């Protein structure tokens, strides 16, 4: 069983991976955009991780407002990535993603919206299909004035919905270089300002649980969730 605290970011270079470890992370999900996917890049990041005793898993984020294109991309990249994310914002995309158990994380459901991108129905779908909601801390930090307050409000609203309906939530630094990397304590401290400490702890541990779940499903003896071949 995989344990520890894992960041979600866009860090693939050796210095970045060393920095993540020094800051206190147990591992990370290195995310590529689906239209820039390179097996060579993720393999080199995994090798850097092995060199420094740091777990690196592959992530692919699908970014499109076309639902058919999104579904095709999910099928294409599901077996290429450990963790599959879909960028949200469009309400039809948000809903469809939360209906799909082949997707692990709905990223930024509030993106470019005047609301938080979720309601109680969508939160229930995420809970039923084990699709997590992402809080992208990097996006919050990069925003200014009204946009920052709007994102923060969306985070708070989505946390309330997720907690009520037991929808998984992850928090990510979203870092693309060493200057964007944050320590686990920084993200935990932020979460403590918007929700209770016990729920913050649960959120910090959710990424490793998602990885563990996907690794389990990749086992040759597992046909589907709950159905496993047992050799006598």
Curated annotation (Swiss-Prot):
Positions of transmembrane segments: none
UniProt keyword annotations, A-Z: Cytoplasm, Endonuclease, Hydrolase, Nuclease, tRNA processing
Enzyme class, broadest EC rank: hydrolase
A GO BP entry: tRNA 5'-leader removal
A GO MF term: ribonuclease P activity
EC numbers: 3.1.26.5
Catalytic activity of the protein: Endonucleolytic cleavage of RNA, removing 5'-extranucleotides from tRNA precursor
Gene3D superfamilies tied to this protein: Metal-dependent hydrolases (3.20.20.140)
One GO cellular component term noted in the UniProt record for this chain: cytoplasm
Entries under InterPro entries matching the protein: Pol/histidinol_Pase-like, RNase_P_comp-3_arc, RNase_P_p30
Subcellular location: Cytoplasm
Keyword field contains Cell cycle: no
Residue pairs linked by disulfide bridges in the UniProt entry: none
Main function: Part of ribonuclease P, a protein complex that generates mature tRNA molecules by cleaving their 5'-ends.
Subunit structure: Consists of a catalytic RNA component and at least 4-5 protein subunits.
Family the UniProt entry places it in: Belongs to the eukaryotic/archaeal RNase P protein component 3 family.
Record protein name field: Ribonuclease P protein component 3
Organism for this UniProt entry: Methanococcus maripaludis (strain C7 / ATCC BAA-1331)
Taxonomic lineage of the native organism: Archaea, Methanobacteriati, Methanobacteriota, Methanomada group, Methanococci
